[in-house]
């Protein structure tokens, strides 16, 4: 199984839909904690869901379970209230239910997890959700609509962890 991710940034909805179609995506799971944007209002929840429906793509909101800014105060650094502690989020039942829902959806339809940030390296799609999926041996492909894509594979993740444990660090992988 492969789960895709995409960040909408501030491009037009037509561009995102075109990219999603090119990957055969049938369902978008929106993992924004707040599915509204002043900078990209075309991606406000109801409007974007309608655009996707017209394109034959299902829209599912999952930010209440898989959002990057959880409501649970125990998920934040006590010394920096803006810093989310992803290792704490991962322990929460509501997060695990969200992951189970994502996996169920992905067994039924080609699925893309969507957030606002285009670069997955700066988004909880990579920093949290992809890491959980990799731990379950699920491949993750980050779609970069501004050019290219990047894969995260469970085998590579295992090698990176082993190299880190042996003290080799980033220079090895």
PLM features: residue spans?
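Residues lining hydrophobic/aromatic ligand-binding pockets adjacent to catalytic sites
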Residues: 1-173
